[in-house]
């Protein structure tokens, strides 16, 4: 979400490589950085630093590179399980994904799973790189392209218009000057620049602030504090208080930061917002302040979840239908029950599954909202809302 033009002098986009194991994701990442970034050798990418996000360890490699038009931050994961976790936990929110498919083997099970996950977690664009073209048969490459386009369409991406680049990441890494070598990387970068739109900066989106704390200031009224997630708020604007109970309308009568009054607050800032005529007991942590009509409270939704393994600090045993953990959404824990789908009877630690969740109280939410699943105060899983039900 950060189109930080200021820092790099050009728009910024987050991308990542996805695709089946051994189809060449890491080799491609190395080839791109060799020609467009500070070169990172293959074995350095694979020895990724372990990142801890919400207590879940994901091995990811972060590299960056730039074209004349843009700056890209790129994430590559060594193992399939890490991809699944990374996409669900959102340790690296991808604006676009480069789908790597071997021209020798064509789409494989993880190719499908990664495309489906990309759709569920809201990756906006996919660009395809058909790899190993130097050792694949030309007819086979045409067939692979057709299959990949069909697969993308099946999972809701515009399969007919997705750019497909054919090449060899290994040849590109060896500085080969043929069509399949460095030229294929140039073409891939060109397609990323052309096809992937720079995401709107959070500031341009409708105002939203998850409430962290509520204070009563004598003579001035009620102040709520939190970090503005997106948009801007100005004194005098009408806002809604959403979630946990009936939605209320109020007016922002002041925005303050570090005891200073501001004329407006914008995305990324931690602020206090003074609410007109709202009593201290009418607002609580876990609700959100938002621009009227932009977000609604819901109790039932479908989600894509990852359940931590025992070694990651998760449960030691499986759970069954109607399991009732806490769901930590934005700033608060809410109890809910999990319904298993597709005839599944239980979920093992380490599994990635689609589930239906029903919360005991409604929470302001949109598709794409990420949450942690907790039990007795510790995180046992992580998820992302894939569809609102009611």
Swiss-Prot record:
Signal peptide: none annotated. One of its GO terms (molecular function) is GTPase activity. It catalyses: GTP + H2O = GDP + phosphate + H(+). Residues 131-134 are annotated as: G4. SUPFAM superfamilies: EF-Tu/eEF-1alpha/eIF2-gamma C-terminal domain (SSF50465), P-loop containing nucleoside triphosphate hydrolases (SSF52540), Translation proteins (SSF50447). It is an enzyme of class 3 (hydrolase). The keyword Disulfide bond does not apply. Pfam families: GTP_EFTU, GTP_EFTU_D2, GTP_EFTU_D3. It is found in: Cytoplasm. Monomer. This is Elongation factor Tu 1.
